[in-house]
Swiss-Prot record:
Keyword tRNA-binding: yes
Secreted found in the keyword field: no
SUPFAM superfamilies, A to Z: RL5-like
Signal peptide positions on this chain: none
Role description: This is one of the proteins that bind and probably mediate the attachment of the 5S RNA into the large ribosomal subunit, where it forms part of the central protuberance. In the 70S ribosome it contacts protein S13 of the 30S subunit (bridge B1b), connecting the 2 subunits; this bridge is implicated in subunit movement. Contacts the P site tRNA; the 5S rRNA and some of its associated proteins might help stabilize positioning of ribosome-bound tRNAs.
Protein name per its UniProtKB record: Large ribosomal subunit protein uL5
Family listed: Belongs to the universal ribosomal protein uL5 family.
Keyword list, A-Z: Ribonucleoprotein, Ribosomal protein, RNA-binding, rRNA-binding, tRNA-binding
Length: 187
């Protein structure tokens, strides 16, 4: 019987060895538990057109599963809205919550592979923090992820990505994400 060693994700290892110490020195924390870290990453794909054509949600589910390596949860409408021809319970989106090693591997692929592949990418906006150190940004198509075959895309779909951290304010969250390698625009 062979023993296999589980490799630590590259970004997680960098966080533990370098980034935590740098943040501790920058913010002068009294306790190591105060150092901000990443809790989870939520990837959401809203498919409003699925209200008219139910088959469109399957493409979003397949794309999200390929990108994240996890089966998405189908999000359904909470209430009916006549103007949008929407009934309660209709599928209108898909969502994946990533934690642990999958989260670190996704962030690594996002920062090092996907974001640099965006055409005319000038950096992420540093103003999209929510006040408690969490960061949300949107991508307008799924083709920048190398898991998606460009020829098999039935239609471009955007997605929202939320990075939830243990930071208590935006300055700590921004420092953590910048240290992890998020390319923020310089104002």
């Amino acid at each position: 019987m062979t023993t296999t060693e589980k490799a630590l994700p590259r970004l997680k290892q960098r966080y533990r060895e370098e980034i935590r110490e740098a943040l501790q020195q920058e913010f002068n924390y009294a306790n190591v538990m105060q150092i901000p870290g990443v809790v989870k990453v939520v990837v959401n794909m809203g498919v409003g057109d699925a209200a008219r054509d139910a088959k469109l949600i399957n493409g979003a589910i397949n794309d999200l599963a390929l990108i994240t390596g996890q089966k998405p949860e189908v999000r359904r409408a909470r209430k009916s809205i006549a103007q949008f021809k929407l009934r309660e319970g209709m599928p209108i989106g898909a969502r994946v919550t990533l934690r642990g090693d999958r989260m670190w591997e996704f962030l690594d692929r996002l920062i090092s592979i996907a974001l640099p592949r965006i055409r005319d990418f000038r950096g992420l906006s540093p103003k999209q923090f929510d006040g408690t150190g969490n960061y949300t940004f949107g991508l307008n198509e799924q083709s920048m992820f190398h898991e998606i075959d460009v020829d098999s895309i039935d239609r471009p779909r955007g997605m929202d990505i939320t990075v939830v951290t243990t930071a208590t304010n935006d300055a700590e969250g921004r420092a953590l994400l910048r240290a992890l390698g998020f390319p923020f625009k310089e104002n």
